[in-house]
């Protein structure tokens, strides 16, 4: 059996209530995720879009032992690259803070108002983080303080230089070497075209 670059969302759904009982909604440790390649990111995603965060809202949901906090993050869509997220799209992520109670899930992305991101979305409302490879499916558009240009950083806020290195160890990259959002989106479009051509053969 080959390793999968993303979590089995059905397993997460069944194991979650037991984890919540055991730790009283304090911390959940995520299973180690094998970083997907760029090809896997594009292929696995049901939606790929660039958007700006316009709302972040955490609420208690569920009953009894399955009561937990979900966070809803809404994006104003700037560009759809795969699928159609419409003009506004909301993802649901397990965990968050309501009042003075926090339920934290390690390795999950944290969003705030005004964030500009390119997301690779799968199984929204069905798995605890609806991104391909969890934090690997989020790419942040960040303004470089030295040059003033927008660059792409990954879920760990590390500058991205070469999409072909995804899923493999890459040496440290400086902000000056990072690709722009337009370059990243061009790489996505090329991968989508290549995958469509292979499917048509």
What does each model-identified segment do?
Residues 2-14:
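Positively charged n-region of N-terminal signal peptides that target proteins for export
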Residues 11-201:
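Transition segments tied to proteolytic processing and entry into folded domains
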């Amino acid at each position: 059996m080959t390793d999968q670059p993303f979590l089995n969302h059905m397993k997460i759904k069944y194991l979650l209530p037991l984890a919540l009982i055991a730790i009283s909604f304090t911390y959940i440790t995520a299973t180690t995720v094998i970083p997907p390649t760029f090809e896997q990111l594009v292929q696995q995603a049901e939606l790929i879009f660039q958007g700006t965060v316009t709302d972040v809202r955490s609420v208690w949901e569920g009953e009894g032992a399955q009561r937990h906090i979900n966070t809803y993050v809404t994006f104003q869509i700037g560009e759809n690259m795969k699928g159609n997220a419409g003009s506004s799209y909301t993802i649901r992520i397990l965990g968050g803070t309501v009042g003075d109670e926090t339920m934290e899930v390690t390795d999950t992305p944290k969003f705030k108002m005004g964030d500009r991101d390119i997301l690779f979305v799968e199984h929204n409302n069905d798995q605890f983080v609806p991104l391909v490879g969890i934090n690997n499916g989020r790419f942040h558009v960040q303004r470089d303080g030295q040059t003033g240009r927008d660059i792409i950083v990954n879920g760990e806020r590390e500058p991205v230089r070469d999409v072909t290195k995804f899923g493999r160890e890459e040496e440290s990259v400086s902000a000056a070497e990072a690709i722009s959002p337009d370059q990243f989106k061009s790489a996505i479009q090329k991968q989508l075209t290549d995958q469509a051509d292979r499917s048509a053969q």
